[in-house]
A protein has these predicted regions:
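Short intrinsically disordered, low-complexity coil segments enriched in acidic
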Residues: 1-4, 111, 154
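N-terminal glycine-rich phosphate-binding loop and ensuing alpha1 helix
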Residues: 1-54
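Generic beta-strand hydrophobic packing signal
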Residues: 45, 125-127, 151
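Active-site/binding-pocket entry motifs
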Residues: 6, 78, 147-148
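Conserved beta-loop-beta/alpha segment of the NTase-like Rossmann-fold superfamily
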Residues: 57-58, 62-144
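Short, flexible helix/strand-to-coil boundary loops that buttress conserved ligand/catalytic motifs
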Residues: 13, 41, 60, 129, ...
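Short, flexible, basic/aromatic active-site loop/helix in glycosyltransferases
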Residues: 144-154
C-alpha cells in the first residue's frame, strides 16, 4: 500500500515524491521491498497508489525490469487499509496474498511467515513488532496464544 500523503515525512518528501519513494541507502524504500518480495518468491504484486502515485508508476512500470509483475490500484480518495482490501477483492480472486505498507523498511522471511500461516490454518496472519513510540502507531493487544484481542487505531 502506497497511497498516503506522508505528512510526517514532509521535510523529506516536500510533497514532490510519495513517502515510499524516499531514498534509503541510495534507492527508493519501495524498491527495497520489491527486491525482498522477489527474493522470497513473491513476484505478482499489486500496488495501491494515491497521492503522487504516478511517480511510483513511472519508476516501477509493469515491474519487468525488476523481475516482478506489477499491477496498480489507484485510490481516488484515501480508503485506509480496510477500504483497500474491499476494492482489491476482485484483483486477488481469493488467492493467498501478502499486504503491507509501502513505507516500511523490513527484513522479513516471507516464506517462514507463510509456512506459519498455513500451519496455524489461519484466516489472516499479521507481522507485528514491539513499539517504543505508541503515540503515532496502531496498537494490538494479544492473548497468550498471540491472537489479536483488541486493536487501537492511532
Amino acid at each position: 500500500m502506497a497511497g498516503g500523503k506522508g505528512t510526517r515525512l514532509a521535510a523529506l518528501t516536500k510533497d514532490e515524491i510519495p513517502k515510499p519513494m524516499v531514498p534509503v541507502a541510495g534507492k527508493p524504500l519501495l524498491l527495497w521491498q520489491v527486491e525482498r518480495m522477489k527474493e522470497n518468491g513473491i513476484t505478482d504484486l499489486i500496488m495501491v497508489i494515491g497521492h503522487l502515485g504516478n511517480k511510483i508508476k513511472e519508476y516501477f512500470g509493469d515491474g519487468e525490469q525488476f523481475g516482478v509483475s506489477i499491477r496498480y490500484f489507484e485510490e481516488t480518495e484515501p480508503l485506509g487499509t480496510a477500504g483497500s482490501f474491499y476494492y482489491l477483492k476482485d484483483m486477488i480472486h481469493g488467492d493467498r496474498f501478502v499486504m503491507m505498507s509501502g513505507d516500511l523498511f523490513f527484513d522479513i522471511d516471507f516464506q517462514r511467515m507463510i509456512r506459519f500461516h498455513e500451519e496455524k490454518g489461519a484466516v489472516a496472519t499479521l507481522f507485528v513488532h514491539p513499539n517504543g513510540h505508541p503515540f503515532d502507531s496502531d496498537l494490538l493487544v494479544l492473548d497468550a496464544n498471540d491472537k489479536v484481542t483488541a486493536f487501537d487505531s492511532k
